[in-house]
Amino acid sequence: IYARHVLALKRIEPLGTEPSARERGTMIHGVFEKFVHAGLDLDLPEALPKMMEMARDAFAGLAPIKERRDIWLKRLERAARQFLDYERRRDAEIVERHAETKGEWLFPALDNFTLVGKADRLDVKRDGTLEIIDFKTGGVPQPKDMTAFEAPQLLLEAAMARAGVFPGISPRDSSALTYI
C-alpha cells in the first residue's frame, strides 16, 4: 500500500513481456521521426534499407525471441513501403517536413490554462498552408467523430498551428488533416 499510494510506484512488467500496442506504436513513430529528421532523399534506392536499419535499431530490444522481433520488423517493412510511397507521391508539393513537433498554447484568460499538443507531422505545402498528419497504428477516427469533437486531436493541432505555437513554424492555416 505504501509503495502504491504514498510513493505512487507502479508495477513494472517482467523482463521478456511483449510490448503493448501503444509501445510498438511509439517505436514506429520514432522510426518515422528519425527518418524525416535525417532528411534523406526519398527517391534514392537506399531510402527503404536506411529506414529498416533505423527500425532494427529501434526494435533491438523488442523481444528476447528473435523470431518475434522479426515478425514486427516484417510488419514495419510493409508500413515503411507505404510510408515511402505516400511521401514520394506528395514530395513535389511539400516545402518543409516537421516531425513530432510539440507546441504549447497559453490561455491567460482561462487561469493560465495551457493546451499542449504533439503533432506527428506538420508539413508546409507550396501554397503556404499546412497538412497535419497523424500516423495511426491502431484504429482511425471517423470524420463524424472529429466534427463532434470526440476525436479532437487534429482539429486542436490546426488551431494551434493557426496561433503559431509550434516552434519553427509561423502561424498558418491548415489545408488538410490526414490520418495515415
Model-inferred region functions:
Residues I1-K34:
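C-terminal, charged and often intrinsically disordered regions of DNA end-processing helicases
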Residues Y2-L9, M52-R56, D123-K136, Y179-I180:
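Active-site-adjacent bridging/hinge elements
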Residues R4, H29-V36, E77, R81-L84, ...:
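Short, well-ordered alpha-helical packing segments
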Residues A8-I12, E33, H37, G138, ...:
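Short, well-ordered loop/turn and helix-capping segments at boundaries between secondary-structure elements
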Residues G16-M27, A47-A55, W72-L76, D111-L115, ...:
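Secondary-structure capping and boundary motifs in well-ordered enzyme cores
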Residues M27-P108:
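A non-catalytic, helix-rich entry segment at domain boundaries
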Residues P45-M52, E96-H98, L156-I180:
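Substrate-binding beta-hairpin/strand module that engages nucleic acids
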Residues H98-V165:
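Non-catalytic protein-protein interaction segments used by genome-maintenance enzymes to assemble
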